[in-house]
């Protein structure tokens, strides 16, 4: 009898344990299902990259949008990961760095100094200068930074240091508390994300912007000696980041990602030089380096770079890290497949944006990557001739001022841009383009006052321009695969906007 009772007790205990395990599993799956996936989409690859990454890129959205790990690896073999966060003030950057070091210790840290002037620690308090909307946005942005990291000692320390309200801190410990109401808005990506299937467009943490802001304001450059001298919480936490680097034997490099900043922002950026001097480390203020970017073609907004600006900035930074700092070249070494895959994803992303651009500005910007071959046709007297930003983007491709010459002639303009054969040919007045050899065939173009003929291949009478359905279109762009020579796209634009077929 005693044996039977003992067996029943054991059975009850086992059933209770099994029930608790099933309950925990269901809660875990529900938590993963309803969470917003942006944090794991942004930094999910970090945990695989951490043991191999030589460089961590830290900072605000300027870092996310401005430094591309795929460019660093493709051009220089630099194995990096972009841990920048939207709206990251330096206290957030510090704690993200602390949590990241639980998974790997890089040899180098590149730290963007933007938002150095911010003088608050608690995101849910801030100062009188910020609104409730600012505080709410900061908490949302912190979720994107921190949700990917498992809850533990350092995440708990981050929340205690960054959020004063204990109820808000609990949301970060259990995503289900914050996101339980998302059941009605779940999408396919939410279910795939439960099982770790990758989603989204981040490239090793970088998020590239394939748009152009043609209305960026430009400001005179202030002298580097003009600085923001006030002590701030931002400066305190930058020093904490540098102290942590010293403790972990990580070599830090301070940077200012370039953009068209006003005079006050320039003075704030310049003040990072004093902290760099204090620690005896480099400060690369790229706003004082000539010709890294052209703000009129390389920015997505007044303060953020687009994908082309990011490529240029990353190429400049990579050259410095490689030749002057001594970051190793990992190309050809085993174990860096994650970076090789990121390079492939990057180029696939470029082509996808070429074939489905936001507008004509975005299209011309993205064609600068030379991932496709193209023919650009502008109809006679098109508004595109009178848009200075569009002309600058075309001149980036052609390498000449030919588009300026053609503006106002009442004649069509044609540019043949073929990176495979290094061909850049454009119309000059009424002189036809004859027998231009390209990777996708022989091109001929004739422009008349009321008609233009573009042929590709042997049949010189077959017009590749669509005059039947789109004769009044401002701009037509033909896109060719550089490997096969096949036409993969024919895009139409009116008044700068994409006309979808």
Protein language model features and the residues they cover:
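Active-site segments of SGNH/GDSL-like serine hydrolases
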Residues: 239-265
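Hydrophobic membrane-insertion alpha-helices, especially the h-region
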Residues: 11-31
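Secreted/periplasmic serine-hydrolase-like ester/acetyl group-modifying domain
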Residues: 128-248, 329-350
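C-terminal regions of proteins
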Residues: 266-341
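N-terminal Lys/Arg-rich, disordered targeting/topogenic segments
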Residues: 1-10
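Alpha-helical transmembrane signal-anchor/signal-peptide segments
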Residues: 32-53
């Amino acid at each position: 009898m005693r044996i039977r009772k003992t067996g029943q007790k054991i059975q009850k205990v086992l059933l209770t344990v099994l029930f608790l395990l099933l309950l925990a599993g269901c809660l875990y799956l529900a938590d993963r299902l309803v969470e917003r996936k942006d944090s794991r989409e942004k930094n999910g690859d970090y945990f695989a990259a951490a043991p191999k990454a030589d460089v961590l890129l830290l900072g605000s959205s300027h870092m996310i949008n401005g430094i591309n790990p795929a460019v660093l690896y493709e051009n220089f073999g630099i194995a990096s990961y972009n841990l920048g966060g939207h709206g990251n003030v330096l206290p957030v950057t510090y704690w993200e760095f602390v949590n990241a070091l639980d998974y790997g210790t890089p040899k180098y840290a590149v730290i963007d100094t933007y938002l150095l002037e911010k003088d608050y620690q608690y995101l849910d308090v801030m100062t009188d200068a910020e609104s409730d909307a600012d505080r709410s946005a900061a908490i949302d942005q912190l979720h994107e930074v921190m949700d990917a990291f498992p809850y533990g000692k350092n995440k708990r320390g981050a929340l205690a240091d960054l959020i004063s309200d204990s109820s808000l801190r609990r949301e970060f410990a259990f995503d289900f508390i914050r996101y339980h109401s998302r059941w009605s808005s779940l999408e396919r990506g939410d279910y795939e994300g439960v099982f770790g299937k990758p989603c989204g467009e981040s490239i090793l943490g970088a998020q590239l912007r394939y748009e152009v802001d043609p209305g960026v304001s430009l400001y005179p450059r202030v002298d580097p000696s003009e600085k923001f001298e006030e002590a701030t919480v931002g400066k305190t936490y930058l020093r904490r980041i540098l102290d942590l680097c010293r403790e972990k034997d990580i070599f830090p490099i301070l940077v200012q990602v370039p953009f068209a900043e006003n005079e006050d922002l320039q003075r704030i950026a310049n003040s990072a030089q004093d902290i760099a001097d204090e620690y005896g480390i480099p400060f690369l203020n790229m706003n004082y380096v000539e010709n890294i970017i052209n703000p009129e073609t390389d920015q997505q907004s007044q303060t953020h770079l687009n994908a082309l600006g990011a490529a240029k900035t990353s190429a400049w930074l990579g050259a410095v890290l490689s030749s002057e700092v001594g970051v190793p070249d990992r190309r050809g070494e085993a174990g860096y497949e994650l970076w090789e895959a990121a390079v492939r994803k990057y180029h696939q992303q470029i082509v996808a944006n070429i074939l489905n651009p936001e507008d004509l500005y975005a299209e011309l910007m993205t064609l600068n990557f030379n991932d496709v071959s193209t023919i650009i046709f502008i109809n006679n007297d098109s508004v595109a001739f009178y848009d200075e930003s569009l002309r600058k983007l075309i001149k980036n491709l052609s390498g000449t001022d030919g588009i300026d010459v053609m503006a106002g002639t009442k004649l069509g303009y044609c540019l043949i841009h073929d990176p495979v054969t290094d061909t850049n040919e454009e119309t000059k007045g009424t002189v036809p383009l004859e027998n231009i050899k390209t990777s996708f065939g022989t091109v001929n173009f004739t422009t008349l006052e009321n008609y233009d003929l573009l042929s590709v291949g042997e049949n010189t009478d077959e017009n590749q321009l669509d005059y039947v359905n789109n004769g009044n279109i401002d701009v037509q762009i033909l896109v060719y695969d550089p490997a096969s020579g096949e036409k993969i796209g024919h895009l139409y634009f009116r008044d700068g906007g994409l006309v979808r077929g």
